């Protein structure tokens, strides 16, 4: 795995990959809206790999450490290097723990697609295949919808929130929700707030006595928000439990409700043809 970010600080490569509580995300200004703060994942992969190699390139220098089953085998020390900044990680799962393991691209591919949908402009390469998105969550709906939308996908975005909405002839509702880039397959407080706020805004726009269930029937939508220090209902992080967007912020329900009240209502007023089809 190779990326081209800033790179791990060269004197911290060993600590970051082997010592607990050495995550780089405690500075709230830089990483306040992350999924995890502690950097546990990389240590777990290291401990459960028969071989693990990590190298960081930064400002013309590099440093690397090799491990076997979590134990240091060798360290390169600082060496000159002309590679672009960023880390490189290579690992082989421990066959005594993961017997007959195999990488399944059909499971990896949806994760990578979601990453590019949530980070417009990001490019990810996997075994020669390229994943890229120019239109964010609009591309996500176009990728995953199994029926044609009845009207052009409504795309709304603001600080720490992105929303797409449309309807189709399918029965029921279909939602995709994300928090800080994490796909919350079980929803949570943000999805509950979105469903309520979207239907309320649509009902108020038309000023008709619609049932909420009728408004949501056939709705296909996605929402992505960023929350400071998110709380999930389990370690799998598939359902958001946070009530507020941050220690000093509004509730998630108010944040999403206020955004949709303004932006979705404005959109429907400005796009009469879409509003007519939705009706």
Roles of regions detected by a PLM:
Residues 2-4, 15, 26-27, 33, ...:
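GHKL-family ATPase ATP-binding module
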Residues 7-10:
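A short glycine-centered beta->alpha linker in the GHKL/HATPase_c
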Residues 17-21:
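Short acidic-aromatic loop segments in the C-terminal HATPase_c
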């Amino acid at each position: 795995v190779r990326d081209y970010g800033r790179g791990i600080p060269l004197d911290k490569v060993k600590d970051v990959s082997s010592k607990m509580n050495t995550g780089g995300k405690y500075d709230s200004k830089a990483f306040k809206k992350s999924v995890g703060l502690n950097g546990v994942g990389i240590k777990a992969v290291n401990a459960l790999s028969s071989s693990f190699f990590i190298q960081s390139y930064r400002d013309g220098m590099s440093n690397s450490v090799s491990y076997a089953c979590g134990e240091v085998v060798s360290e390169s020390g600082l060496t000159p290097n002309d590679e672009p900044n960023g880390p490189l990680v290579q690992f082989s799962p421990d066959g005594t723990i993961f017997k007959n393991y195999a990488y399944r691209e059909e499971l990896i591919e949806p994760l990578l697609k979601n990453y590019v949908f949530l980070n417009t402009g990001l490019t990810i390469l996997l075994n020669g295949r390229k994943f890229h998105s120019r239109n964010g969550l609009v591309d996500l709906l176009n990728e995953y919808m199994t029926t044609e939308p009845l009207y052009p996908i409504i795309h709304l975005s603001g600080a720490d929130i992105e929303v797409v909405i449309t309807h189709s002839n399918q029965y029921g509702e279909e939602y995709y929700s994300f928090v800080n880039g994490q796909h919350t397959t079980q929803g949570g407080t943000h999805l509950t707030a979105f469903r309520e706020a979207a239907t309320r805004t649509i009902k108020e726009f038309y000023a008709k006595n619609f049932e909420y269930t009728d408004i949501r029937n056939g709705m296909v939508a996605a929402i992505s928000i960023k929350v400071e220090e998110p709380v999930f209902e389990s370690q799998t992080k598939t359902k958001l439990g946070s009530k507020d967007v941050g220690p000093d912020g509004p509730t998630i329900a108010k944040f999403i409700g206020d955004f949709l009240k303004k932006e979705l209502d404005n959109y429907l007023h400005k796009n009469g043809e879409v509003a007519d089809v939705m009706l």
